[in-house]
């Protein structure tokens, strides 16, 4: 395995401002190798099928315990990486609007620092497609050592992250194929599910709503 630090150093040496810039440039230069396949399926039909897969999984999940922890936590730390950061940012903003103290460091180093300050009174939410990102796994280990409970949102059922989690919210598997970069649709559905459960179970009685 190659560490995230090594990858960032390589990206900087290649004069890219960020890994995202490097990835976009790589995709552009390899564009001729990608095949555009006509799936013969209406776009709305395709979206509907994908959404149904995740909704069917969410129907069989009970996260009432996690919702209780989120509401009563001293603070909620959100951990993620890559494209999932956009989803995590939405979750962080909405939790804050609900009056829940939310910590969302955009930098891995600050994420480590925040994890070391966690106590059993805090709660952690992790968003990861594959559940194996080393930096996030390390942060989760620190959180567990500090007595925190963790909610994982992931596509993969069995992973290093799932073994460290107290609550797991699985979503349907998506694919990246050439230009068809995954939009994190399933992750968006998952956080919307969490937010609505928060409202339904607890927040209607709060004065700020």
Give the residues covered by each predicted segment.
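Short, flexible loop/turn segments with low-complexity composition
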Residues: 205-209
